[in-house]
From Swiss-Prot:
Entry annotated with the keyword Cytoplasm: yes
Cofactor binding notes: Binds 4 [4Fe-4S] clusters per heterotetramer. Contains two stable clusters in the N-termini of NUBP1 and two labile, bridging clusters between subunits of the NUBP1-NUBP2 heterotetramer.
GO biological process: cell projection organization; iron-sulfur cluster assembly
Protein name: Cytosolic Fe-S cluster assembly factor NUBP2
Subcellular location: Nucleus; Cytoplasm, Cytoskeleton, Microtubule organizing center, Centrosome; Cytoplasm; Cytoplasm, Cytoskeleton, Cilium axoneme
Binding site for ATP: G26, K27, G28, G29, V30, G31, K32, S33
Family: Belongs to the Mrp/NBP35 ATP-binding proteins family. NUBP2/CFD1 subfamily.
Length: 275
């Protein structure tokens, strides 16, 4: 993996990771962790080996979405061994949720302690060989984002996915997120609009619960790619609540088509960053 200009990446536990993707959102509640989880599953079904690093320290929801809560993190000579969420060991996950004695325990830490854990997650987790490392970040632009960027900056290619919903208030937050990417030199892979209409489970008709097309218009104005829209889907919601593989179990759903298409576009965009 190449180092950024003026920096040198020391050999370490990210040496076998080919691509790193940060998933960002300007505000909470837009389905950022949903997109991170389903992107990882879609990439796995394309034959990729994927890791998920959950640095949303105060809201670690991905272990539940992948039915991995309660699993233990073990030590090896190279550091922490991530939790494998499938028998094939094609998706590995590291989250603060595995380090809490009680899953309902609140993480009430000051900045330095959060920074130290994020740095440890980046340097001390034995990821092995991965095609993609998906990093699920907290909402907004906080100290955790800066700590994550500083830890990952020496590694390339590194890009960001920005998740939004159609509402105007969410779009305004995404503008600030794109400004954050520009100021920190983080390349934007593209914008994803989540909750883009509701798909009826009976007739498959899509109804716009909110406005429509705002994410695509924002991407156009910002000069970044628009990767697609994901509709509200009751099957997707149920899969996340039950920790099931939506991509495998519901290939005929509208959300499946959207998510797999987005995953393919992400692969193409990350390949372009390598060239």
């Amino acid at each position: 993996m190449e180092a950024a200009a003026g920096e040198r990446a020391e050999p370490g536990n990210l040496a076998g990771v080919r691509h790193i993707i940060l998933v960002l959102s300007g505000k909470g509640g837009v389905g950022k962790s949903t997109i991170s989880t389903e992107l990882a599953l879609a990439l796995r079904h394309q034959g990729k080996k994927v890791g998920i690093l959950d640095v949303d320290l105060c809201g670690p929801s991905i272990p539940h979405m992948l039915r991995a809560q309660g699993k233990a993190v073990h030590q090896c000579d190279n550091g922490w061994v991530p939790v494998f969420v499938d028998q094939e060991q094609s998706i590995s996950l590291m989250s603060v949720g595995f380090l809490l004695e009680n899953p309902d325990e609140a993480v009430v830490w000051r900045g330095p302690k959060k920074h130290a854990l994020i740095k440890q997650f980046v340097s001390d987790v034995a990821w092995g060989q991965l095609d993609y490392l998906v990093v699920d970040t907290p909402p907004g632009t906080s100290d955790e984002h800066m700590a994550t960027m500083e830890a990952l900056r020496p590694y390339r290619p590194l890009g960001a996915l920005v998740v939004t919903t159609p509402q105007a208030v969410s779009i305004g937050d995404v503008r600030r997120e794109l400004t954050f990417c520009k100021k920190t030199g983080l390349q934007v892979i593209g914008v994803i609009e989540n909750m883009s209409g509701f798909t009826c489970p009976h007739c498959a008709e899509c109804t716009n619960v909110f406005s429509s097309g705002s994410g695509e218009e924002l991407a156009r104005l910002a000069g970044v790619p628009f990767l697609g829209s994901v509709p509200l889907d009751s099957q997707l919601t149920r899969s996340l609540e039950e920790g099931r593989d939506f991509i495998q179990e519901f290939p005929k759903s509208t959300a499946y088509s959207a998510l797999t298409s987005i995953a393919q576009r992400v692969v193409h965009r990350m390949s372009a960053l390598c060239s």
